[in-house]
Amino acid sequence: MVKTILIPTDGSDYGKTAIDYGIYIAKKLAAQLIGLHVVDVGLMQGPVFSDISGSIGLPPYQEFLPVIEAGLNERAEAILKAFRERCEAAELYPEARKAIGIIDESIIEAGKKTDWILLAQRGEHFHLTKGSILGSTAELVVRKSGKPVMVTPATYQDIESMALAYDGSPPADNALKLAVSLSEKAAWPLTIICITGDQAVADKLHKKIEAYLEPFQIDCETIMIRGQEDREIMKFIREGSVELLVMGAYGHNRLRELLVGSTTSDVIRKSKIPVLLTR
């Protein structure tokens, strides 16, 4: 099912937690871990530094470039060494790779040859992200990657049970398949939550779920909840009854997201447990 998991790592505290989750899940699923550190090409090009150096009479930026490149490469090797050591301490022997480029694009490209991407909710440059519309690296990877993406929070806890947020959309159907497969493989009990104020819709969703689950022998329950999607999902997470949430990503169109916001983005940013997303 899941043979390879890509873990982008930047040495941040959030990134270290992502590695711990990767180790735990790799053992559960017998998967190979691949660590990736992306040297941000923006730091190497340094347009801001170039402008400043010229205006205050410092030597041209090009004279500093070899020193900057050497420092970034040295740091990359140290981060990947720490990744390998963390995995090897848990008796896992990962691959470790370095790339130079735009961070989200490099992650997506590397992820094409893996089954999952697992990355931190926030990275080293969280406060320097591109703004609320485009969002964080995690959101960009979820939106653009064709692979399941697990986004991990600040702190680690073992996963013993999981929930699926289900609304009947095509991404949610894919998430249902993924959640059931995971429940079988990892023996995690599954709670499916459907959030709607329409009883007819609730009945339709329940029948659809039951029909899909019929061939499977897993520990599963379905709960119908009235309310607003993002609020009820976050409330369910805060109750602490599960340690992993699975959901379909960006099930609505971009115009609706711009007007009323995206449940996916809201959950990615605020969740205190890992969120596994699929398109």
State the predicted function of each range.
Residues 1-63, 144, 157-224, 242:
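Small/aliphatic-rich secondary-structure junction motif
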Residues 15-17, 21, 27, 96, ...:
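Gly/Ser-rich helix-loop-strand patches that form or flank binding pockets
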Residues 87-98, 214-221:
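A short helix-to-beta-strand connector/capping loop
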Residues 210, 228-238:
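A short, acidic, amphipathic alpha-helical segment used as a generic capping/interface helix at domain edges
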Residues 72-82, 86-92:
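Ordered, amphipathic secondary-structure segments that act as subunit-interaction surfaces
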Residues 58-75:
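A short acidic, glycine-rich active-site loop
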Residues 101-104, 227-231:
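Short acidic loop-to-helix transition motifs that present clustered carboxylates
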Residues 18, 22, 83, 107, ...:
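Aromatic/hydrophobic pocket-lining residues that form π-stacking "cages" and hydrophobic walls in ligand
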